[in-house]
Design a protein with these regions (language model features):
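Conserved active-site "lid/cap" helical segment
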Residues: 1-61, 65-69, 73, 77-80, ...
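Active-site pocket-lining segment
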Residues: 158-161, 197, 205, 275-344
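Flexible glycine-/small-residue-enriched beta->alpha junction loops
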Residues: 109-162
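Condensing-enzyme catalytic core mediating Claisen C-C bond formation in acyl metabolism
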Residues: 1-24, 223-287, 293, 300, ...
Length: 391
């Protein structure tokens, strides 16, 4: 099989809920990320063989969101496009499917990533059969199709509370983790550690010039001193709060994948090699710990031991996700999410799987490290993981 390399990878800033990116539909955000990834290496869009983009709550975005993103980015109409929905792991699964296409010889150049605008997710009302008596009920599309377990109809946070109880993580443990995430992301931005991965977004305004969004918005919204005083968000006696959980966000990320041969032919320097990847799943209510199942599978496929991995990125759907998976895998937080994670940076559902991979690539570069692993849980009890080697 062909070796798969990453030659370009960028993301938009992550916008807060109803924040700076809230008026930009997901396909438009995806287009900005795709165009940015292509421009970074001066790659002709006509050379792209396929586009695969993750997008979770697609209601209201129009037909074929990935196709829209590709066309808006200047990709020719002749290039096939696919939209992936693996809930929070959608962006990572898109990269995995792109890598598979290249490895098997079905493509030489694939753009893969993810996108989400949670601010624009609509409410639903069942009007096909009419309401014979009484009021109709509006259903929040974000809640129904993004943030609630389909089997027991509990919010994802209820599962996080159960995880904290099972693995003995206190409210204080989770708050400390959240504070560390905010501290790390703030310091990383101050040190310019996100400059290479984030591209600006010009947001059209009703009047005047577009507003430029150049930085993640979420990490500046917190009041650290208030974190210990927040009420439980999901269960009466729970320990998960709005502050130690990830937030509702908008954003997009895109990577350009190539076969090693094609990168050499085009004189493009690979940034990283995809060494292996894997999915795993168990009971839906324990989705929080599924990364601890997916990561060992990806490592085994890569013939790499966990001790050889120098830096890890776990998607912080909740603080307890980071804590529990570190505990299960025997990891220290010294090399996990060193530039902060989704608790502080934000979690645009379809984007996050690609976002953590892009962040990992930059962390490896910044620390002159070689091997990294990224893993992300997803609703329904699943997870995905990727192992990369910096070139």
């Amino acid at each position: 099989m062909k070796e798969v390399v990453i030659v370009s990878a960028v993301r938009t800033p992550i916008g807060s809920f109803m924040g700076g990116l809230s008026t930009m539909p997901a396909p438009r955000l995806g287009a900005i990320a795709i165009e940015g990834a292509l421009k970074k290496i001066n790659l002709d869009p006509a050379l792209v063989n396929e586009v695969i983009m993750g997008n979770v709550v697609q209601a209201g975005t129009g037909q074929a969101p990935a196709r829209q993103a590709a066309i808006f980015a200047g990709i020719p109409n002749t290039v096939p496009c696919t939209t992936i929905n693996k809930v929070c792991a959608s962006g990572m699964k898109a990269v995995m499917q792109g890598a598979q296409a290249i490895a098997l010889g079905d493509a030489d150049i694939v753009i893969a990533g993810g996108m989400e605008n949670m601010s624009l997710i609509p409410h639903y009302v069942q009007m096909r059969t009419g309401t014979k008596f009484g009021p109709s009920t509006l259903i929040d599309g974000m809640q129904k199709d993004g943030l609630v377990d389909a089997y027991d109809e509990n919010a994802m946070g209820v599962c996080a509370d159960a995880c904290a109880l099972k693995y003995n993580f206190s409210r204080e443990d989770q708050d400390a983790y959240a504070i560390q995430s905010y501290t790390r992301s703030s310091k990383a931005w101050e040190a310019g550690k996100f400059d290479n991965e984030v591209i600006p977004v010009a947001v059209p305004q009703r009047r005047g010039e577009p507003k430029m969004i150049t930085k993640d918005e979420e990490f500046t919204n917190v009041f650290i001193d208030k974190i210990p005083n927040l009420r439980p968000a999901f269960s009466k006696d729970g320990t998960v709060t709005a502050a130690n959980a990830s937030t509702i966000n908008d954003g997009a990320a895109a990577l350009v994948l190539m076969s090693r041969e094609k990168a050499n032919e085009l004189n493009l320097k690979p940034l990283a090699v995809i060494k292996g990847y894997a999915d795993a799943a168990h009971e839906p209510e324990w989705f929080t710990t599924a990364p601890a199942k997916a990561l060992p599978k990806a490592l085994a496929k890569s013939n790499i031991s966990i001790e050889e991995i120098e830096f890890f990125e776990f998607n912080e759907a909740f603080s307890v996700v980071g804590l529990a998976n570190m505990k299960l895998l025997g990891l220290s937080d010294s090399n996990v999410n060193v530039n902060g994670g989704a608790v502080s940076l934000g979690h645009p559902l379809g984007c996050s799987g690609a976002r953590i991979l892009i962040t990992l690539m930059n962390v490896l570069e910044q620390n002159n490290a070689k091997l990294g692993a990224a893993a992300i849980c997803n609703g329904g009890g699943g997870a995905s993981a990727i192992i990369i080697e910096r070139v």
